[in-house]
Amino acid sequence: MNRTPIRRCKSAEIEEDPFSPIPKFSRLRTPRTSREYVCPLKSTSPQSPSSSTENEPPPVSVTSPPARKRALEESTVTPIQQKIGPPVLKRSSLSKLADGFRTAAYLNNESENDDDPFGLSFRNEQVLMSKCAPAPEKRPETLTLDPSKCLPERDMEMYRKIKKLDKFYDWQQECLSDKRLLDGENCILSLPTGAGKTLIAEVLMLREAIVRKRNAILVLPYVAIVQEKISALAPFEDAFGINIEEYASNKGRFPPIKRRKRVSVYVATIEKANMLINSLITQGQLDRVGMVVVDELHMIGDGGRGAILEQLLAKFLYKGTGQIVGMSATLPNIDDLKFALRAFVYSTNFRPVELTEFVKIGQTMHQVSENGDLNPAGDLPTNNLKSTDPDGICQLLAKLIPKNSAVIFCPNKKNCENVAVLIAKTLPAHIRQAKRAESDAFLQSYLSDNDDERMDAVLKQCILSGVAYHHSGLTQDERKCVEAAFMEGLIYVVCATSTLAAGVNLPVRRVIIKAPMVGRERLGKAQYLQMAGRAGRAGFDTKGDCITIIKAGEEERWFREMLKSDIPRCMSSLSSEESMGSFILDCVVLKLAENIEEIMTAVRYSLFYAQESPENIRKLVESSVKRLEEHYFITIEPLEQDVASEPSAQASSIPRVPGKISPSDLGNAVFNAGFDPDEATRLHADLVSSLNQGVIFASHFHLLFIITPYEQVCNINWDLFLLMYNALPSSERKLLAECGLEEKFILEAIITRVDLTAGTPRMRLYIALMLQKIWNHEPMYTVAERFGVEKGWLQATLQSSISQAASIAKFSEKITTMWPLRKLLPELVQRLSEAAQPELLPLMTVDGIKKARAAILFKAGYKTVGMIARANPLKLVQELGTIRMAQANSIIASARMVLRDQVDEKMEELDVWGVATDSFNYF
């Protein structure tokens, strides 16, 4: 075997740049072979000449949509392409990290070596194998792939222009040309993270809105993702003449506004989507929804929220006439979901950007093979910063930044902050100062727009150095600031908790998992894949890698087992009496079911029915019905002939109930408020107790206590509690005494340092004291500092309290004895939500306008939402001074949405009175 000549290093080369690592002998290698991914396509051979046309997509039709086919269809799953041929071999070059991270990071990424996937070199010459792309398959000639069949040509061109797309991936063209999808059959898209599933969802929703003239619902897991998607879809409003409506947090009306001439795409969280489905069924308007798209479909097995997702899908399957499209990258038991949703499955292993997974144990790198084995890939140089950076994170960033970016997933919030500070201190000066001026201007803009005009001092210094941390302890504004700075290239490294993996999309070149833990729990297979999938996103990088740092020993053993294990099955969340009872109550109130047999019919459309035997299902349904009756949520009218013919029915531990089932006033109230029945039982008892004993009106403290959520908990500062207790008026001390919180108890707690649990009256009273400070217009930053809690936690608690107050108000609408709460709580909600001058409140309904910015606009003459909606973006930038043109356009677009909603609500009222409104125009 011929060997390539060895290049010797001359001493002159070293003297030219004393900061460069000392080069060692390295073997020259031939250029790397192409690794371009080609989508493995399913081949469908025609059975007969007459059947060959079945593969051709139908032309665009503007007729009414076909009814969904209820029968289960055989799934045609695109087979995952196996790797073909030997792996591509990479010969590592040799170098040494001189003077730790500072010297190595001095090197520019312009000299990045493709042979070195870590941005570093190994000390030995072990072979490093890289994942090889599958060989292309020949596409069947009988299959005509034309995604324009999904949308009219003009609209498809407009979509490509907005999304800046040259062409679709092969699998996207194939999927959008699938006859089953175009015929309205339900579909599950199972593809890797970053494969481009979102494009399919957007095109299908546009097809439903433009071609079939029906609304669509996009269900997303988190509020932050909904807000991000609203911004991404905003250009569709003017381009396609549709409405994009947000249903998250405190946004969204029930029932939705009846639009004139336009159809809507509702972008909603799981909870809001369920309430939206309920309101449409109540109004008899569910047929207006032609499509429900669910992102992260695997969350159907995620406990409480999974139960809500399963319920909304079951109700839509049972009574709706539209199409369901579910998307996920981690669905192990996909056949169960296929059965439950009456869907076919489209699956491929295509990923547009190559992803390589590594595990770092000590100073040795291992590559993760397809079957989960760890193959030694080489040794890293000595970690010269081991005393301050024992995990060697700085080594893994050395040649990556500032040209590329990285996300470091840490086990907890405190660890995020510590790692971010470490990296910020260790970065070379030329990297820290590279964009300091731009970062400083960016932060000044943020602070001028922020009502508190303050930011965490540590976070601010990190951002100025090109590093940041991101976790739930930050406020929403701080998190958005970090995300915006990252997208503008001012931040190179983000240290985050695991929630970011399923949250906001931050495209990075490298993902580093600092420890295989989430809090105190071990990292699961699905979580690991989700984190790793964040590396190397299409349109931003040509490749990506994930490096997990593991300790040798027990941690290494179970991590190896996790890599080789299967993803846990996605199990139904309706398997308990609590969750099944909630579903049954919804069905009864919505008049979807009036007896056991009709309830059993509704359950047939759930994942639970696909995973459990009919006998166990009936047993759970009957016990859940009995439980609802015992808690007075429903009433049962047994049929006389059945009672006479079955005298032994009462002797049964779980009786068969043959009569009509109706909701009680309490059941209607629970449904109207969107409460869980178990939660409502405790809440109802507390509300009755408060009203019977009398609400203390000397201040708003008692009302704030009533709306304090049960699930919130924090550490108690008993010394502060005693000071605040002594400062309370006698009327408020009376309330604390009724809840068992007297001065004697506080004094004992100061000594014993007792911890309070979530939901107890004492804990809720302590949280109510924080809400009272905010009610009195104290800045949130100051309140959080005084009580020793995180600003992000306090903000989340405030928002949860506002939602709780709104829900209690709806709850009170159905129970006549609670009329005082129905009258008092709406004002409380408004004041807690805005806490501003009354004249500024209308302006603050616009996204991007808070109290400080609203005051500037009001002073400049923008006194109504309509004036902002008609504003010139350039003039708006000049008036505010601290915003960019993109922000100005976003504010104007949001103002137009608010104005549109207000006008449509008035038009809806005029339509009821028979007033002609066809000639009206918004602007």
UniProtKB/Swiss-Prot annotation:
Catalytic activity: Couples ATP hydrolysis with the unwinding of duplex DNA by translocating in the 3'-5' direction; ATP + H2O = ADP + phosphate + H(+)
Any single GO BP term: resolution of meiotic recombination intermediates
Keyword Transferase applies: no
Sample GO molecular function, one term: ATP binding
Biased composition range(s): Low complexity: 43-55
EC number: 5.6.2.4
Start and end residues of each stretch annotated as Disordered: 1-84
UniProtKB keywords: ATP-binding, Chromosome, DNA damage, DNA repair, DNA-binding, Helicase, Hydrolase, Isomerase, Nucleotide-binding, Nucleus
Motif DEAH box, residue numbers: 295-298
Family matches, as CDD domains: DEXHc_POLQ-like (cd18026), SF2_C_Ski2 (cd18795)
Positions that bind ATP: L191, P192, T193, G194, A195, G196, K197, T198
Top enzyme class: isomerase
GO cellular component: chromosome; nucleus
Domain of life the protein comes from: Eukaryota
Residue ranges occupied by any Helicase C-terminal domain in the UniProt entry: 392-596
Task of the protein: Single-stranded 3'-5' DNA helicase that plays a key role in homology-driven double-strand break (DSB) repair. Involved in different DSB repair mechanisms that are guided by annealing of extensive stretches of complementary bases at break ends, such as microhomology-mediated end-joining (MMEJ), single-strand annealing (SSA) or synthesis-dependent strand annealing (SDSA).
Protein name (record): Helicase POLQ-like
Organism: Caenorhabditis elegans
